[in-house]
Amino acid sequence: MNPTTSTTTTPVRIDVWSDFVCPFCLIGSLRLEQLAAKTPIEPVWHAFMLRPPGSPPMSAEKRAMIAEYTPKISAQIRDEFGLVVERGPIGASSFAAHHAMKHAERHGKAIAFNNAVLRAYWLQGEDIADHDVLRRIGATLDLAFDDAVLEGREPVTAEAVSVDLAQAQAYNIHGVPAFIFSNRYYVSGAQPLELLERAADAARGEPVAVH
């Protein structure tokens, strides 16, 4: 970031496709929090489901692979952010959480809800497929989720989730997190803070290179 940048600089919009059960999405979210402390940004969270409804049961090989890489990611999160990972159930569906997120967005609380769900799953071992868990998280933000929202039957939130998923397809987003800065720069994966900062500066029009 340019050191002369004023704190009144217009925030850079960052569209983020993310899934709550993705460890790299937790890292990406934490790095966005770090970025927000350095330069004005406006994260807009979009739904992405690594295991959409109708996915086959997770194979034993996939579960073993997740169990193998989890300690490495846990160590990275501990060393970089000082947080202890206590993961929720492997294979938990994020369907209801994404629909709840769109309800939270309508009330101006998407960022807070996103952060709360990520922390509930990754740091508190909660099952975010459990509607009672989501309702409890929502209550901390003065949000109430009825069955229609959490079951994907509420038309407005269901349409918003569908639009997010369709946009991801249109942009050829096949993995998350994925960041689009001001509709100009695309960054894929849990990249270092320095790269996100360069992307934000470039989106703002400052003379930096983004790779």
Q: Where do the language-model regions lie?
A:
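Structural alpha/beta surface segment adjacent to cysteine/selenocysteine redox centers
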Residues: 26-124, 206, 210
